């Protein structure tokens, strides 16, 4: 029997116009075989607090998970993390998330359009959620006779701290975080344009 462990941590961060579809809502079978994992940590910047939780409808599966997790106190919530979790999911938290989603959409739209217009040979998909963007730089690297390590170092050298996409099984990918003020997104893309992708 197959059990699905579904990481739903980004479910709060769908961009405006898109909707998160929980794995457990797809079918009765999915509901019974899925362990869905959630946390407010990415959405509300609470990663330092232990506030993850799971939703498991299948009683037998839930009992197994709860027994295994009770053997260690490593992931046990404390008073502060419980109050942070409750506070995050109050109406004020949702209002904040709605505003955050608008900022992330603005950043994602700007980045997507800028890349298509200015970074010839870089491919990407328009994101539907979260704040990460994956740049497929294979064509660009081949056209410029360079490798991904050199490209990554060039960005870091001009203050663009991006992440190697290879650990995510994408050999020429760069992972770019767009969770920052829009003015800094514009500055980062200006630097990438002048000093990395279109350097003279």
Which residue ranges define each predicted feature?
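PLP-dependent enzyme catalytic core of the Aspartate aminotransferase-like
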Residues: 30, 143-146, 153-162, 167-200
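Proline-centered loop/turn at the N-terminus of a beta-strand
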Residues: 1-3, 33-35, 161
């Amino acid at each position: 029997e197959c059990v699905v462990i579904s990481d739903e941590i980004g479910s709060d961060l769908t961009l405006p116009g898109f909707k998160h579809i929980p794995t457990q809502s797809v079918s009765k079978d999915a509901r019974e075989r899925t362990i869905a994992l959630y946390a407010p940590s990415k959405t509300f910047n609470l990663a330092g607090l232990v506030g993850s939780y799971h939703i498991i409808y299948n009683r037998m599966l839930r009992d197994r998970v709860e027994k295994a997790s009770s053997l260690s106190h490593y992931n046990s919530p404390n008073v502060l993390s419980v109050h942070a979790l409750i506070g995050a999911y109050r109406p004020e938290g949702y209002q904040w998330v709605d505003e955050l989603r608008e900022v992330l959409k603005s950043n994602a739209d700007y980045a997507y359009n800028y890349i298509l217009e200015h970074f010839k040979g870089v491919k990407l998909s328009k994101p539907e959620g979260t704040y990460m963007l994956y740049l497929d730089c294979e064509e660009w690297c081949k056209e410029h006779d360079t490798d991904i390590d050199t490209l990554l170092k060039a960005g870091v050298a001009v203050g663009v701290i991006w992440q190697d996409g290879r650990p995510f099984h994408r050999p020429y990918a760069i992972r770019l975080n767009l969770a920052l003020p829009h003015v800094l997104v514009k500055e980062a893309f200006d630097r990438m344009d002048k000093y990395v992708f279109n350097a003279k």
